[in-house]
Amino acid sequence: DRVRETLFNWLASLAGVGGGGLPGWHCIDAFAGTGALGLEAASRGAASVLLVEQESALVDQLLKLKTKLAAEAVRIERGNGVTALERTTANSMHAVFLDPPFESPALYEPSLRAAARAVHDDGAVYLEAPRLWNDEELAPLGLHLYRHLKAGAVHAHLLRKGPASAA
């Protein structure tokens, strides 16, 4: 879809690679759902992708899809996305994908805080949310808005580490 294509164009520009590739990148999709974002990163050359999902039925689907696609760079873990991010080595991820359930607003702040710790200084955090997150809200979490796109009811954010003045 258009949002996903835009996201991966944004990420490829950060990676400095033509053709939309993410070679050597380490990524985590903390609320994987169908795995679309993480699997797309793997298809674009990411070295490792961790898909984290709580619902066992979705985890089963992800495992089948990983096998079908022979996605060797992909690991799948059943669990809480925030907890997985908190366990991730600091500054180790080039891309952190956050698409928490829109009906769970309490997940956003802890997810963003954990993502800011996990993401590499040259990396990015992608957030899908039902509303725009501005720099005033993001700054205490250690992030700033780098790119934004609104598509229907979805606000797609690409966030970077540090204050907005570092953009």
What feature does the model see in each segment?
Residues 1-167:
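Class I S-adenosyl-L-methionine-dependent methyltransferase catalytic core
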